[in-house]
Amino acid sequence: KECDLKPEEIVAKIKDAGVVGMGGACFPTHVKLSPPPGCKAECVIINAVECEPYLTADHRLMLEKADEILVGVTILMKAVNVTKGYIGIENNKPDAIKLMTEKAAQYPNIEIVPLKVQYPQGGEKQLIDAVIRRQVPAPPAIPINVGAVVQNVGTAYAVYEAVQKNKPLFERVVTVTGKSVKNPSNFLTRMGTPMSQLIDAAGGLPEDTGKVIGGGPMMGKALLNTEVPICKGSSGVLLMNDKEASRAAESPCIRCAKCVSVCPMGLEPFLLATLSAKQDWERVEKEDVMSCIECGSCQFTCPSHRYLLDYIRLGKGTVGGIIRARNAKK
């Protein structure tokens, strides 16, 4: 049925249900739906790109819950008082694009936008640029500064369940996969479930497992053991074999600039990594480390196998703390 709640009532319900960004950041959804003074939303963009290799949780969700997702989108649009919604889906999901386009025919204000297969197309700023051709300035600017409210497709479904069913967010779809996994699957999983249970359900831990990754191969993080619980931002569990998990030794930078050419934010990863290693935090901040989206493209393409993302994450975390401390004194 159609949602007859007022925008503020919708936001309150979403807050009470504990709905957060399901793409991994876990940013509270009710905060995104409450623009700061002076900012006005013009559209809602649903991120259904799922550009990380191996992960298929959002893809599966669209194939099985298309109607519910579209209702969730209309609720999000009503919450921020806009009349236009977009759902961005990469072209490598033709079945999802076809189904969502057919289902969206009854929603004239919602447009399905097929997107080029390109990592990291699912980055918030990259998605906004691809869908509405607007560029979000450097931090502290956020999507609402260009009139966009971006939500993950899983969040749209969670919003539907929260508002229409009064159901809090206590479960999500999680991909369990890997080249050696016997039965790669997507599981509807309750928060707090140990990853070991999901691995068992997918056929057990392969003997040649070299690493267990929480998330995808590009932006995920290696886990110490399989007893780590599933949380709201857990999109997948990736089991890498010994060969995939092996890490080449670092070599000196050869100044090829490949990391610069692939950076979606136009940064200089080689410089940020070098400055972070030297702990030159003032320069690291000046070189705009906070704009890094940690996509890992630089490290993936580096012929010298430099641990660029590791150093940049160190720099970003340190500079972020310095900025917060500085702002607290004001």
Model-derived features: where do they sit?
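Short, solvent-exposed coil/turn elements at secondary-structure transition points
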Residues: 116-118, 218, 242-243, 278
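Hydrophobic alpha-helical positions that pack around
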Residues: 83-195, 201-206, 216
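Ferredoxin-type iron-sulfur electron-transfer modules in oxidoreductases and energy-metabolism complexes
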Residues: 234-250, 260, 264-330
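Iron-sulfur-cluster electron-transfer modules
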Residues: 1-130, 255, 289-290, 294-299, ...
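Conserved mixed alpha/beta catalytic, RNA-binding, or beta-rich assembly cores of soluble enzyme
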Residues: 14-26, 37-42, 47-69, 163-252, ...
